[in-house]
Structure formats: structure tokens, C-alpha cells
UniProtKB/Swiss-Prot annotation:
Organism annotation: Rattus norvegicus (Rat)
Entry protein name: Ubiquitin recognition factor in ER-associated degradation protein 1
Record's function text: Essential component of the ubiquitin-dependent proteolytic pathway which degrades ubiquitin fusion proteins. The ternary complex containing UFD1, VCP and NPLOC4 binds ubiquitinated proteins and is necessary for the export of misfolded proteins from the ER to the cytoplasm, where they are degraded by the proteasome. The NPLOC4-UFD1-VCP complex regulates spindle disassembly at the end of mitosis and is necessary for the formation of a closed nuclear envelope. It may be involved in the development of some ectoderm-derived structures.
Gene Ontology cellular-component terms listed: cytoplasm; cytosol; nucleus; UFD1-NPL4 complex; VCP-NPL4-UFD1 AAA ATPase complex
Family annotation (Pfam families): UFD1_N1, UFD1_N2
Keyword field contains Acetylation: yes
Classification of source organism: Eukaryota, Metazoa, Chordata, Craniata, Vertebrata
Assembly notes: Interacts with USP13. Heterodimer with NPLOC4, this heterodimer binds VCP and inhibits Golgi membrane fusion. Interacts with ZFAND2B; probably through VCP.
Encoding gene (name): Ufd1
């Protein structure tokens, strides 16, 4: 049995309601047309020829249409969705990042097969540059960018556009399978540390020995001049007794306090230094204490006393 290919493009083959064919792939920048199709580069969908739509419509294909792309020369594969069926026959257009994952060059052959994927529940990404940390809300940015994608494959490096800058993210993990659909799904997203990111080094704090003396080398020395430390002058020339100011505390006189070993994190305790009042009992002295109205009285007119 001999088979002849009478057309310039391969004929799609159908096995058990499955679409499978080969196309020559090109990047979206080579798509002919007056309109700018840079929006295709921002997502994970491809552009296929109209004949593919004719074949898919005859099959019992579940929606959304998802495809597995395989480069047999490099044994690399990925998954994608379809955006439009306007490409030339025998040609499909892929985003540039997808061609890099498949190690495809312009005009290379790629195997396209229809597949059914499970809905994603979890995915983990690793930014390929520390610049991704400059984004204020990375989860919101990623959620907005993934609206242009149909599925995710573990190991792929996807590209998202934010603030006129391209950020690359590697898909580290997907659940419940290595290839999942992200259309109308509730998916938990997690991030790994960016590639080449180094945590800032924290200064090492050396523990001071409790028994050793404290280092007071950082204390400021005694100042020679102090404002308002002299004696004042009065207008009448008299001198007023001024109590001498207390001598400043020397660093050597400072003693360490006892730490509170019962301290609990998040509990604030207000400690009041209440001093008990000392009751002073004064002893009564017979000759030295003054008692009011204790003397003898005197009268202006002397009266005789009756016997």
C-alpha cells in the first residue's frame, strides 16, 4: 500500500474522535494582515487554519477546545487553546514564548492533537527575575494576565506583559495534573522565590556576657561648659543661697536591672513604684514642747481672797 500527499499541507487525521495533524508553525509577528495582532503574544492561544475548524466540527469535541503541541525532534510538548481559525492552510501561528518552550524555529513542524484536561485547583509559579518583586500586587496582575490563557503545563515558562514590560514565570507545579485547564476555575496561586533572588543579610548580634562589665565607650564625655550653672546677681546686692546641683551620674555608677522572666509577648504591664508612708511618732518632751494656754492668768484688779 502506498500513500501519496497531493497537497502542499498535511491532511488532518482522525482516530477515535481525536483531532491530530502536523502544521508548520510561525510566530505571530509573521502573521499577514493590516491589523496588529500583538495581543496574541500576551496569551496562551494559537491561530489555526479554517480546515481545522471543519474537522473539529465533525467530531464530538468537548468545549473549550484544547490542544497538545509536540515537537518530536526535541521531545518537548505543551498545551494551548485556539483563538481564531484564520491562518493559511498548513500553517499555525504561535506566541513567541511558546515556540521557545518547544525549541521550534520559524517554519518548524509541530504535532497538534486535541485533548481533554482537568480543571486546575492549584498552581505555583517562579519568577525568572527579581524585578517581579517590584509589582505591588503580583497575584492581581497574574490573575488578569491568565485570562488570555486556556491551560497551564508544568515546566513551561510563560510570559506576561505589565506596564510595558515582559515578565517570565516558570510553572513549577499544577494540580490535579501536570497539564490543567484554567478556564472558569477557582485556582489557588502560590509564588516561589524569584530566580537569582538573595535575601538581605541581617547584622549578627553578638551576645554580651552577663557577668562582664558593660562597654561604655559610646557614652559622651563630660562637657566643660554648662548653661545656667553659675551664681545669680540680685539688684539689692544680697546673695541668695543656691543649693548645689546634683553631680551627674557617671557611667560606672549605672547598674543592670533584673529582667522580668515572667514577661509574656503581647501583654503590657504598668508598674507603679508605690512607697509606703513611714509613720513618725514624736515623743513628748516635758520641757521642750509648747502647749497653748498653759500659763498663769493675770487680772487688772486684785481681789482679796476670803478666808
Amino acid at each position: 500500500m502506498f500513500s501519496f500527499n497531493m497537497f502542499d499541507h498535511p491532511i488532518p487525521r482522525v482516530f477515535q474522535n481525536r483531532f491530530s495533524t502536523q502544521y508548520r508553525c510561525f510566530s505571530v509577528s509573521m502573521l499577514a494582515g493590516p491589523n496588529d495582532r500583538s495581543d496574541v503574544e500576551k496569551g496562551g492561544k494559537i491561530i489555526m487554519p479554517p480546515s481545522a475548524l471543519d474537522q473539529l466540527s465533525r467530531l464530538n469535541i468537548t468545549y473549550p477546545m484544547l490542544f497538545k503541541l509536540t515537537n518530536k525532534n526535541s521531545d518537548r510538548m505543551t498545551h494551548c487553546g485556539v483563538l481564531e481559525f484564520v491562518a493559511d492552510e498548513g500553517i499555525c501561528y504561535l506566541p513567541h514564548w511558546m515556540m521557545q518552550n518547544l525549541l521550534l524555529e520559524e517554519g518548524g513542524l509541530v504535532q497538534v492533537e486535541s485533548v481533554n484536561l482537568q480543571v486546575a485547583t492549584y498552581s505555583k509559579f517562579q519568577p525568572q527575575s527579581p524585578d517581579f518583586l517590584d509589582i505591588t500586587n503580583p497575584k492581581a496582575v497574574l490573575e488578569n494576565a491568565l485570562r488570555n490563557f486556556a491551560c497551564l503545563t508544568t515546566g513551561d515558562v510563560i510570559a506576561i506583559n505589565y506596564n510595558e514590560k515582559i515578565y517570565e514565570l516558570r510553572v513549577m507545579e499544577t494540580k490535579p495534573d501536570k497539564a490543567v485547564s484554567i478556564i472558569e476555575c477557582d485556582m489557588n496561586v502560590d509564588f516561589d522565590a524569584p530566580l537569582g533572588y538573595k535575601e538581605p543579610e541581617r547584622p549578627v548580634q553578638h551576645e554580651e556576657s552577663i557577668e562582664g562589665e558593660a562597654d561604655h565607650s559610646g557614652y559622651a564625655g563630660e562637657v566643660g561648659f554648662r548653661a545656667f550653672s553659675g551664681s545669680g546677681n540680685r539688684l539689692d546686692g544680697k546673695k541668695k543661697g543656691v543649693e548645689p546641683s546634683p553631680s551627674p551620674i557617671k557611667p560606672g555608677d549605672i547598674k543592670r536591672g533584673i529582667p522580668n522572666y515572667e514577661f509574656k509577648l503581647g501583654k503590657i504591664t504598668f508598674i507603679r513604684n508605690s512607697r509606703p508612708m513611714v509613720k513618725k511618732v514624736e515623743e513628748d518632751e516635758a520641757g521642750g514642747r509648747f502647749v497653748a494656754f498653759s500659763g498663769e492668768g493675770q487680772s487688772l484688779r486684785k481681789k482679796g481672797r476670803k478666808p
